Amino acid sequence: MRTFPGGVYALTRETPDTERLLAEVEAALAGGVAAVQYRDKSGDVAQRHAQASELAALCRRFGVPLIVNDDLRLADLAGADGVHLGRDDASIREARIILGPAKFVGASCYQSLDLARAAQTAGADYVAFGSFYPSPTKPAAARADVALLARASRHIALPVVAIGGITAANAAPLIDAGADSLAVLSALFDAPDVRRAAAELNRLFAAEPEE
């Protein structure tokens, strides 16, 4: 089983403009993002399948995994590298049965170390916590404490992803606390230069941790 890569985890915006979507993701990949998550809950079935399939092919060119948010069937049909599941989605065990041992299964654990322990027991490949900062895409999301990342690093033997309002200006404390990956949407795809924004975030993982 592969280990989910650490670094910048790009979360795509929802858009019917597939050409724009692919151009933005390609720029993020060129900037060094480690993984991409396709998120779209409003498009029709045909659009979502087409976008996910094209993104999977694009990510393969860069050797970067494409994860599909919430939709196990789409992840399977589009040839994605895995699925990310929330508490109301399919079970981790079901995802593992359908996708097999070589694909990634990630789990949203919100602010709960207990959910992370359960996800690990069920066979997840990574766990995600948040929201750590106010999020433009999910303004009502409950906030997580940065100390949760340190506890997770001590007690969970899986890569830890931080999510929620993350920018290059506020990301360092999350990495210092134990985040292996930063899931980012607005700070990447609302930036005037997506490639440069990805590279700036990526450089944070090479910086020396603060004492």
Curated annotation (Swiss-Prot):
CDD domains: TMP_TenI. One of its GO terms (cellular component) is cytoplasm. Mg(2+) binds at residues 70, 89. Its EC number is 2.5.1.3. Keywords: Magnesium, Metal-binding, Thiamine biosynthesis, Transferase. It catalyses: 2-[(2R,5Z)-2-carboxy-4-methylthiazol-5(2H)-ylidene]ethyl phosphate + 4-amino-2-methyl-5-(diphosphooxymethyl)pyrimidine + 2 H(+) = thiamine phosphate + CO2 + diphosphate; 2-(2-carboxy-4-methylthiazol-5-yl)ethyl phosphate + 4-amino-2-methyl-5-(diphosphooxymethyl)pyrimidine + 2 H(+) = thiamine phosphate + CO2 + diphosphate; 4-methyl-5-(2-phosphooxyethyl)-thiazole + 4-amino-2-methyl-5-(diphosphooxymethyl)pyrimidine + H(+) = thiamine phosphate + diphosphate. GO terms for biological process: thiamine biosynthetic process; thiamine diphosphate biosynthetic process. It is an enzyme of class 2 (transferase). InterPro entries: Aldolase_TIM, ThiamineP_synth_sf, ThiamineP_synth_TenI, TMP_synthase. 2-[(2R,5Z)-2-carboxy-4-methylthiazol-5(2H)-ylidene]ethyl phosphate binds at residues 135-137, 165, 185-186. Binds 1 Mg(2+) ion per subunit. 4-amino-2-methyl-5-(diphosphooxymethyl)pyrimidine binds at residues 37-41, 69, 108, 138. SUPFAM superfamilies: Thiamin phosphate synthase. Condenses 4-methyl-5-(beta-hydroxyethyl)thiazole monophosphate (THZ-P) and 2-methyl-4-amino-5-hydroxymethyl pyrimidine pyrophosphate (HMP-PP) to form thiamine monophosphate (TMP). HAMAP family: TMP_synthase. Belongs to the thiamine-phosphate synthase family. NCBIfam families: thiE (TIGR00693). This is Thiamine-phosphate synthase. It comes from Thiobacillus denitrificans (strain ATCC 25259 / T1).
